[in-house]
A protein has these predicted regions:
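Short, charged low-complexity linear segments at domain edges
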Residues: 1-9, 34-51, 279-288, 312-316, ...
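Iron-sulfur-cluster electron-transfer modules
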Residues: 5, 11-14, 31, 41-180, ...
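Residues immediately within or flanking Cys/His clusters that coordinate Zn2+
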Residues: 14-24, 59-69, 180, 266, ...
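A broadly conserved sequence feature marking short terminus-proximal activation segments
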Residues: 17-41, 273-276
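Phosphate-coordination loops involved in phosphoryl transfer and adenosine-cofactor binding
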Residues: 138, 259-261, 337
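Cofactor-cradling patches in redox/metallo enzymes
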Residues: 149-239, 270-287, 292-377
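Catalytic cores of enzyme domains
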Residues: 238-243, 249, 253-275, 287
């Protein structure tokens, strides 16, 4: 599959690239694979009229963490270059590799990448009393749960904790239940632009029907795609940490216990590097009675990617022996943390998997912030 190199370079501002190497120098995946985004952009620039994209296996190693874009002094977006090249591969009729193909097919057929039935999307609710917007539209907030929080047994407790907290704080909210569709974040980042556009159209249509003006998400990936890649037709999106921090500030949530643990925080890339939401999660943790908060050296803008973004939850990549999540666990242990907290379903899964693989369950626990809050409220 060939792309029109000059047109692609213009569309992605590649003629501004000065080949300084800051993108590759900061790329966490470059430490373990042959992905070199500076070199990749150079080859597009010097390709002449056509550039061959079929055989670039490392193209699928990128986690879209945004470090390269943050570091670029010329305001080029190398991450979008990767997504654009992936899109060219898909549009050219080539399938994405590995289990990502299954995930994309599942999104098309069932509205989620996890191969579960769309009819089971609201089973996470269990016996909780939750308002369905199909029955009672017009709530102040749509709680957009997301695919992984709806279906994954490890993540479902986070969704349930949020619902209980909404009730305690008197938040006027509702869910879409089986009407909720995939946000499309990873679909777009795997290069399936056509499917992504279909999801956007379907989601915005149901939001309009249900009177959605504000929505709050479990996942930073959903939050990011809603504010960056969806048409901004009068709706406001929040990540749950923003809303919870606000509720605590307003005194609408009260603590009934304490958590006498040493806790550090892992910044999810799509909350931190992509959207500069660093303070809200920390303010929540630092309010918990008894909790001792410690910071890792690689935090905030310098946070190490867990390797779950950009569709990598469904792609092993070219080097499965070395995992960034294992490094992150070492960093958390290095500052004496008993709990590694985060605020992203993908981060919870990758980091907890690293703990289990290394047999460190008796040394450190991985938890979402909501799982800690539910212990003390």
């Amino acid at each position: 599959m060939q792309i029109k190199a000059r047109q692609f370079a213009r569309e992605h501002s590649l003629f501004s690239c000065i080949q300084c190497g800051k993108c590759t120098g900061g790329c966490p995946v470059n430490l373990k694979t042959e992905l070199n985004i500076r070199e990749l952009m150079y080859h597009v620039l010097v390709a002449g009229k056509k550039f061959e994209v079929d055989d670039i296996e490392v193209l699928w190693d990128c986690t879209t963490c945004n470090t390269c874009t943050d570091r670029c002094p010329k305001e080029v977006n190398p991450m979008e270059v990767v997504i654009g090249l992936r899109s060219a591969v898909v549009e050219g009729g080539r399938a994405v590799p590995g289990t990502a193909k299954v995930a994309l097919q599942s999104v098309f057929n069932q509205g989620n990448p996890l191969t579960f039935s769309s009819e089971d999307r609201a089973q996470w609710v269990g016996d909780l009393e939750v308002r369905l917007l199909s029955d009672e539209p017009g709530a102040e907030y749509l709680y957009y749960v997301g695919c992984t929080p709806c279906y994954d047994p490890r993540i479902q407790p986070i969704s349930r904790a949020l619902v209980r907290m909404f009730g305690q704080a008197g938040v006027d909210y509702g869910i879409l239940g089986t009407e909720e569709g995939c946000c499309g974040s990873e679909v777009r980042r795997l290069g399936e632009e056509g499917l992504f556009e279909m999801l956007v159209e379907d989601n915005m249509e149901i939001w309009e029907e249900r009177g959605v003006k504000k929505l709050v998400t479990t996942s930073p990936h959903c939050y990011n795609v809603f504010i960056k890649d969806y048409p901004q037709n009068g709706f406001e999106a929040l990540h749950y940490t923003q809303l919870v921090a606000q509720l605590l500030e307003e005194g609408r949530l009260t603590f009934t216990g304490e958590l006498a643990k040493t806790v550090t925080y892992h910044d999810p890339c799509y909350l931190g590097k992509h959207n500069q939401i660093f303070d809200a999660p920390r303010s929540i943790l630092q309010r918990i009675p008894g909790l001792k908060f410690v910071e890792m050296d690689r935090s905030r803008e310098k946070s190490l990617c867990c390797e779950g973004g950009g569709g990598r939850m469904w792609l092993e990549g070219t080097n499965i022996e070395e995992r960034l999540a294992h490094q992150r666990i070492d960093e958390a242990l290095g500052v004496g943390a008993e709990i590694l907290a985060t605020a992203c379903p993908f981060c919870v899964l990758t980091l907890e998997d690293a703990v289990k693989i290394r047999g460190l369950e008796d040394k450190i626990q991985v938890a979402d912030i909501m799982e800690l809050l539910t212990q003390v409220t």
